[in-house]
Amino acid sequence: MFNKMRKTKEKDVPVTKEEVLRHPMPNHVAIIMDGNGRWAKKRALPRAAGHYEGMQVVRKITRFANELGIQILSLYAFSTENWKRPKSEVDYLMKLPEQFLTTFLPELVAENVKVQVIGHTEALPDHTRRAVEKAVKETSGNTGLVLNFALNYGSRAEIAAAVKQIAKDVERGMLAPEDITEPLISSYLMTSGLADPDLLIRTSGEIRLSNFMLWQLAYTELWFTDVLWPDFTEQHFLEAIAAYQRRDRRFGGVSAR
């Protein structure tokens, strides 16, 4: 089972951009960007070096996803659990959104990319939050790729907050219990207005979801690779999409093939 979700080596010939464009593309690709620390450790470098290289890959994959016509690219950038890391590492991670968005924002604006953020941004340092808010504001009118960053995000907390708000709305008489449906619950989540991911990519060889979009990933195709995030390339992205295109998505029903 897990082998079917992992990166496969069925073809000796690399997948090409032209090949994947001949088939239906996933509208929403989500990525758990894992392995920055291990990448740095293998090279006897500080963990910050891995995070810096990982940021360069974010640029590269964002550009490529836009070229391919992907509609939404969701990136798990910082989880609610990541605060447990050493303070020096957390401080550096909090600088990365500012560095990334300051240098990359003009290109995002020019390329019609819309920046969105999910997560508890109120808990971010002021300088990080200001950079994020500026990017969201300056790209709010863009209509191309939605670049959705999960910052200080945890799916269980997201679901709990949605349930609390629904309970309050029932108590106030704004909702009746029979009004509570799956689409309604989705509308109370941070991802309200975004389609659920079609494809989830996780790098670094780990096979778990790490509290990321647990509700939204119900019928998402999963693709795992041993490649560490700083080593992830456009070719790996194409391989993930090609694997997705070979899947038979049944959504709990029977195969149409």
From Swiss-Prot:
It comes from the Bacteria. InterPro entries: UPP_synth-like, UPP_synth-like_CS, UPP_synth-like_sf. Its EC number is 2.5.1.-. Substrate binds at residues 35-39, 47, 51, 79-81, 83, 85, 202, 208-210. One of its GO terms (molecular function) is ditrans,polycis-undecaprenyl-diphosphate synthase [(2E,6E)-farnesyl-diphosphate specific] activity. Keywords: Magnesium, Metal-binding, Transferase. Binds 2 magnesium ions per subunit. It is an enzyme of class 2 (transferase). Pfam families: Prenyltransf. Its cofactor is Mg(2+). The active site is at residues 34, 82. The keyword Phosphoprotein does not apply. Mg(2+) binds at residues 34, 221. GO terms for biological process: polyprenol biosynthetic process. The keyword Metal-binding applies. GO terms for cellular component: cytosol. Catalyzes the condensation of isopentenyl diphosphate (IPP) with allylic pyrophosphates generating different type of terpenoids. PANTHER family: DEHYDRODOLICHYL DIPHOSPHATE SYNTHASE 2 (PTHR10291:SF0), DEHYDRODOLICHYL DIPHOSPHATE SYNTHASE FAMILY MEMBER (PTHR10291). Homodimer. Belongs to the UPP synthase family. This is Isoprenyl transferase. It comes from Geobacillus kaustophilus (strain HTA426). The gene is uppS.
